[in-house]
């Protein structure tokens, strides 16, 4: 195998001394699992995406799984998603016992082909799960029109789109439920982690239960649903807050 003199990374996380300081202070506080930084990060991220509610989770993949279940999508239901995307999209659908309906890609945008999408809608279709690919936003005007016409949920996977916009509106603000990833190669990172945003309080409350093992409200160990341990840590939130402070300059640098 030929060895190259220089290694050019696909991505390198942009971390600075403010990030180190934020995490260090949180470590010294002793609040390394739960803590106030989580709620602060959720509030600021909700504001940033123009959504009412935000909930931190352990990864972008976890966010997708919870998003599906929060909408009561399950056995016998179909969810349309692009064939060209990370496996997490289809996995989230399958793990919730629904059926992924794969649609090919538009060669100009790398996103889902809208003409083919329309042909795949059936009486069993409950939602569209649409990631924006490689920084190119989907045509959200057409997508939202389709969802309204067929009464479908829109799960917007904005994992690669933090800070990106479609017609001056922030990506991740279009979905009934929208998800984000904070993996090391994303615009802002917490090492691992994800976020789910929505304007629906009932859905938000269900998301918070599902990510925390669906503990009972009155009797903690009476679980009224099957949830996951998909929690986010106070340490991650501290890093996320610091990163979010400079999202504009991060996106600007990527454009260059």
Sequence positions of predicted segments:
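N-terminal "arm"/small-domain region of PLP-dependent enzymes with the aminotransferase-like
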Residues: 1-32, 36
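Conserved donor-binding loops in enzymes that form glycosidic bonds
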Residues: 12-13, 133, 244
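Short, conserved catalytic or interaction motifs in soluble domains
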Residues: 59, 105, 133, 184, ...
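Active-site region of PLP-dependent enzymes
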Residues: 161-167, 174-256
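PLP-dependent aminotransferase-like
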Residues: 69-158, 165
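Active-site nucleotide-sugar/metal-binding loop of Leloir-type enzymes
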Residues: 120-122, 170-175
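Phosphate-binding glycine-rich loop
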Residues: 31-78, 92-104, 169
């Amino acid at each position: 195998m030929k060895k190259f003199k220089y290694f050019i990374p696909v991505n390198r996380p942009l971390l600075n001394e403010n990030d180190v300081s934020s995490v260090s202070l949180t470590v010294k506080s002793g609040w390394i699992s739960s803590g106030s930084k989580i709620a602060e990060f959720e509030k600021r991220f909700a504001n940033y995406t123009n959504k009412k509610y935000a909930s931190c989770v352990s990864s972008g993949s976890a966010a997708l799984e919870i998003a599906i279940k929060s909408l009561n999508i399950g056995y016998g239901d179909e969810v349309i998603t692009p064939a060209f995307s990370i496996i997490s999209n289809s996995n989230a659908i399958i793990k919730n016992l629904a059926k992924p309906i794969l649609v090919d890609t538009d060669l100009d945008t790398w996103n889902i082909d809208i003409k083919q999408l329309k042909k795949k809608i059936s009486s069993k279709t409950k939602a569209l799960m649409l990631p924006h690919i490689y920084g190119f936003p989907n045509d959200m005007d057409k997508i939202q029109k389709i969802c309204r016409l067929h009464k479908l949920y829109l799960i917007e996977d904005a994992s690669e789109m933090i800070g990106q916009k479609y017609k001056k509106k922030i990506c991740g603000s279009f979905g009934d439920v929208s998800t984000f990833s904070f993996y090391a190669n994303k615009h802002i990172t917490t090492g691992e982690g994800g976020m789910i945003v929505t304007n629906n309080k009932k859905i938000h409350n269900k998301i918070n239960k599902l990510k925390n093992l669906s503990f009972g409200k009155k009797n903690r160990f009476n679980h009224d649903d099957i949830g996951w341990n998909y929690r986010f840590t106070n340490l991650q939130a501290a890093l996320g807050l610091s990163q979010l402070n400079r999202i504009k300059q991060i996106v600007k640098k990527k454009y260059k």
